[in-house]
Amino acid sequence: MNSSSSHRNILVTSALPYANGPIHLGHVLEGIQTDIWVRFQKAIGNECYFFCADDTHGTPVMLAARKEGITPEQLIERVGQEHYRDLTSFGIEYDHYDSTHSKANQEISKDIYLKLKSKGHISRRSIEQSYCETDKMFLPDRFIKGTCPNCKSKDQYGDNCEVCGATYSPKDLIDSHCSLCGTSPVVKNSDHIFFKLGDFHKKDEKSTSLETINPSHLKTDFDLQSWIETSGVVSESEGVKKKLKEWFDAGLQDWDISRDGPYFGFEIPDETNKYFYVWLDAPIGYMASSKNFFEKNFPNEPNKFDSFWKNKNSEIVHFIGKDILYFHTLFWPAMLEGSDYRAPSKVHVHGFIGVNGEKMSKSRGTFIKAETFVKYLDPEHLRFYLASKLGPGMDDIDLSFEDFINKVNSDLVGNLINSVSRVSTTILDALDRTLGVVSKEGLALIEEILYQTVKFGPGEDSIQNIIKYAYDQRNYAKVLREITRLGDRVNRYVNDNAPWKLIKENPEKAREVVTVTLNASRFLAIYLYPVVPKISEQIYKLLNLQDSPSFKDLDKNRILENIKVLPYEMISKRVDEKAIKAMLEENKQSEHSKKVETSENPVPEERLEISIDDLSKVELRVGQIVEAGPVDGADKLVNVKVDLGELGIKNVFAGIKVAYQPENLKGLKVVVVANLKPRKMKFGISEAMLLASGEGESLSLFIPHKDAKPGDRLK
């Protein structure tokens, strides 16, 4: 059971946040889960590196930059800094955080592609592709929405279903439409490049490709299904194995790895206006991030990169959400093995996070951004709470704020921190803040914390080994149950000996109790270090220890005696329910403000049915923006002049600046509510309303057909 019996060399990654939105609690969950595991591996002496990067390519990034009037490079630079700031504010400590838009990533992507091509795993064929006549572009999968052809869930993307996990072609989507303008796309032919995934599954040895770029097809010895079943890469999760079996039984399809320009990404070698699909170079970002780190930090070890990515004696471990299982357990390992790299050792899959028993909701204020959480609450508290919920499977996690308050205040602050604080203030002051020696009785307590035998499954083992094993298996809930139980034992020792009484009657006996308590608490801080590193380091600082907590110090021969202890500083406060309410209220107000500024007449959340007579009262007309400018004192408003043909030019204040820069609006045709009662605002009179859909940076104005004329009425 002892996970530290032999030295391990481990490269760890968490999934890459996409560069067109803020970090929220879903990202934070994965980052914390990964960081705890990495900190544990380092604490027991393993060589372990933690890499991540921003996922920066694709049409969404390109269009988001266009709306802001900046280049994609400028956008991803800013967002990357924001992502890194938000993730590290939760104590997530990367060895290197990179961007997929890097020279190293481009070079490795090219290398992998050309090797796959030379071995016959790449094919070309003409495909029917969705094209938006309004926006004059081929539509990427994520800009097509409709009903899933597999489970019939509505509002799903063009490449995969977030409900059932199925992947498919955009043309298979039912009732598809362009998510930019809402019109139904037309179909055009375009040559695309495919990765023949079926080459890596014996059941699918015959390729379905119509034309092979390299006709000398070479077989591969790597079979995905055998690898999944025998390598243990996902052995701990029956749910994962069941889902993979479904995909194998259905047969593995060739994977389209190209996109037509315009597209923000890497051009495919020897092709014209063809770019790598973002999902090809995104996971390669793991490799590029590690390559950049190794070249900078190990200049005298040129084979450091290969010692992980080409050496199966090392470990490559991915932490991902269950929504990207297909890519990481099928496409990714096949790409690696097919290009002379090695497949991952483990793919650890976690579930989603909800808040108060429901999915995160913007309207209820529970779609919580990382930036907002740290403004009101202690990130260490979230680390502790999520760890108490995390097991080795991929079950979803619920952040119940009532439970959050109780668990943090009771188990962390009221138990594990309390054992330190209750003996470190006035009692230690009266003892010149100096520890004594550990008594025989005290040594028995410390040995209980370090070496006691505990039942585990059908057998038993030492408490240290059980905690280490649970950490290694990502069973953090088990870890915290054991540590909390030990914390109860330490607090019981303090209660039984009452040093606040002894300080008056027998100061040296009080010193002995304090010495035992702080030594016991120090060992608990070591156990806790991967979960709450800041709190553990504060306890170390109190004890005047310069090093970070390390599992090698879990030894009774490392007891601290006759040392001076620093003045006590608050380690952590209890969670205040008022802070949670304030955070949720800010979220709700922020969302409400967006809706108000987007529409002069916000639609209520409850669906309201109207009659045909009501609808006929609304006069929708085509307008053309002839002027657009900012509004002083209103960061989210744009002042536009709209030409409505015979109705003349109307003045409109529109809450669209989050998605559109004024200088990009002139000449744009829009849909206008032309007979809206003029509204007096502090900036002036707003005489109409522009129609738009979506929220935040995804907000899009409704665009009429190019031949429509200003003043035309929509019917």
Swiss-Prot record:
Disulfide bonds: none annotated. Residues 614-715 form the tRNA-binding domain. GO terms for molecular function: ATP binding; metal ion binding; methionine-tRNA ligase activity; tRNA binding. It catalyses: tRNA(Met) + L-methionine + ATP = L-methionyl-tRNA(Met) + AMP + diphosphate. Its EC number is 6.1.1.10. A motif ('HIGH' region) lies at residues 17-27. GO terms for cellular component: cytosol. One of its GO terms (biological process) is methionyl-tRNA aminoacylation. It is an enzyme of class 6 (ligase). Binds 1 zinc ion per subunit. Its cofactor is Zn(2+). InterPro entries: aa-tRNA-synth_I_CS (IPR001412), Anticodon_Met (IPR041872), Met-tRNA-synth_bsu_C (IPR004495), Met-tRNA_ligase_1 (IPR023458), Met-tRNA_synth (IPR014758), Methionyl/Leucyl_tRNA_Synth (IPR015413), MetRS_core (IPR033911), MetRS_Zn (IPR029038). ATP binds at K362. PROSITE patterns: AA_TRNA_LIGASE_I, TRBD. Keywords: Aminoacyl-tRNA synthetase, ATP-binding, Cytoplasm, Ligase, Metal-binding, Nucleotide-binding, Protein biosynthesis, RNA-binding, tRNA-binding, Zinc. A motif ('KMSKS' region) lies at residues 359-363. Zn(2+) binds at C148, C151, C161, C164. The keyword Nuclease does not apply. It is found in: Cytoplasm. Is required not only for elongation of protein synthesis but also for the initiation of all mRNA translation through initiator tRNA(fMet) aminoacylation. Belongs to the class-I aminoacyl-tRNA synthetase family. MetG type 1 subfamily. Homodimer. This is Methionine--tRNA ligase. It comes from Leptospira interrogans serogroup Icterohaemorrhagiae serovar Lai (strain 56601).
